[in-house]
């Protein structure tokens, strides 16, 4: 790690842009890995509901509505603790960002890539992404861009980032861009 490396690295960005790869990169550098979506997955498992993209969005919005827009960040920070070093994936709400900015040593990265590249990556995952073609993928993404105060606010979250990293080249190119952060 370089001197002055952040204690907490937050990741926001579009679906298939490389947030998971960025989280894995920082984990290999010694950061504990957390995802705000894990809080939602735990809730879905508790309810016995399948973990699908639609269920993650719906349940995340319901949790924010019931417990406050920053609930996912609060629950995740409770696991990290005040002195932990972590990379935090799946940040999609400005209240989550506001809460995390109050933590010492927090930096937010927005990860993006061209939509066609992201769609191809998502298709390779083999997960239920609820988008069978590029048009459906774009439509689903539009729903995530600005869902209101207690929903997903992807566009505002990306605009709040300290740095935008475009992942449109090789894996090595992406890692070089990430290395500048840690």
Which role fits each region the language model picked out?
Residues 1-7:
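Extreme N-terminal, non-catalytic leader segments
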Residues 14, 26:
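P-loop (Walker A) phosphate-binding loop of NTP-binding proteins
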Residues 17:
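ATP-binding Walker
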Residues 20:
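Walker A/P-loop
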Residues 32-102, 129-130, 134-138:
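ATP-dependent small-molecule kinase phosphotransfer cores
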Residues 70, 125-177, 181:
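Small-molecule kinase domains that catalyze NTP-dependent phosphoryl transfer to phosphate-bearing small molecules
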Residues 89-90, 100-132, 165:
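Conserved phosphate-donor/acceptor-positioning beta-strand/loop module used by diverse small-molecule
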């Amino acid at each position: 790690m370089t001197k002055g490396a952040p204690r907490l690295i937050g990741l926001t960005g579009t679906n298939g842009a490389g947030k998971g790869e960025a989280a894995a990169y920082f984990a290999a550098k010694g950061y504990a890995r957390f995802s705000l979506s894990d809080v939602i997955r735990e809730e879905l498992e508790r309810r016995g509901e399948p973990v699908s993209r639609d269920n993650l969005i719906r349940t995340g919005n319901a949790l924010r509505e019931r417990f406050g827009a920053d609930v996912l960040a609060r629950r995740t920070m409770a696991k990290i603790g005040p002195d932990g070093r972590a990379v935090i994936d799946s940040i999609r709400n400005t209240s989550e960002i506001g809460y995390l900015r109050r933590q010492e040593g927090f930096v937010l990265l927005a990860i993006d890539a061209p939509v066609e590249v992201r769609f191809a990556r998502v298709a390779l995952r083999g997960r239920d992404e609820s988008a069978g073609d590029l048009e459906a993928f774009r439509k689903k993404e539009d729903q995530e861009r600005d869902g209101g105060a207690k929903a997903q606010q992807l566009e505002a979250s990306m605009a709040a980032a300290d740095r935008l990293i475009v992942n449109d080249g090789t894996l090595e190119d992406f890692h070089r861009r990430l290395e500048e952060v840690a």
